[in-house]
Amino acid sequence: FGVKVGIASTFRGNLIVGARAFHGNPYDGHTLNEQLEQATILMQDSAAKPATAFVDLGYRGVDADNPQVRIVHRGKAKRISEQERRLLKRRQAIEPIIGHLKADHRMDRCHLKGERGDRLHAVLCAAGYNIKWLLRMIAKKGVTFFAIGFFVPATSQRRGPVLAYIGH
């Protein structure tokens, strides 16, 4: 809808953990820090932070700006492990998510006014995608599966690093 929107999703389940609109047509590498910051803020209740970001080649050279996150892209082919090489192939999983946001969740056109409206629209489209994802999982796994997750204390749940796939 005229601005660049960055999407961050989890490694498993492709749940969107960050959606941010960037105005002024910025370079991809200059948007990564803000995108990771938003994903960290939105996941603060889960005590998990993005540890690794699998990105495309537009994010080359931003390793020094983000020392807390390991940035993996195709340009580092000789320096990445075999596991990271396999996970890098999964980076393409963000493309269908972006397609669904544009086609099914009305991200193709924003009817809200101004920069604030664009930012709000991106987050609301991502929230709609996540609600649809959650309803699909409830239908697939059953209501009792999710009810257990809400009543189990947070200290007993296993937590690990969240891998973010960043795409535009």
Task: Describe the residue ranges of each PLM region.
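Polybasic low-complexity intrinsically disordered regions
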Residues: 1-50, 64
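Helix-centered, glycine/charged polyanion-binding patches within enzymatic domains
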Residues: 44-120
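Composition- and surface-driven signal marking solvent-exposed, interaction-prone regions
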Residues: 19-22, 33, 66-68, 112-115, ...
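Generic, well-ordered alpha-helical scaffold segments in large soluble proteins
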Residues: 10, 35-42, 97-100, 104, ...
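Active-site proximal loops enriched in glycine and acidic residues that flank catalytic Cys/His/Asp
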Residues: 5, 9-11, 18-23, 35-36, ...
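A short, flexible helix-boundary coil/loop motif
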Residues: 104, 108-109, 133-168
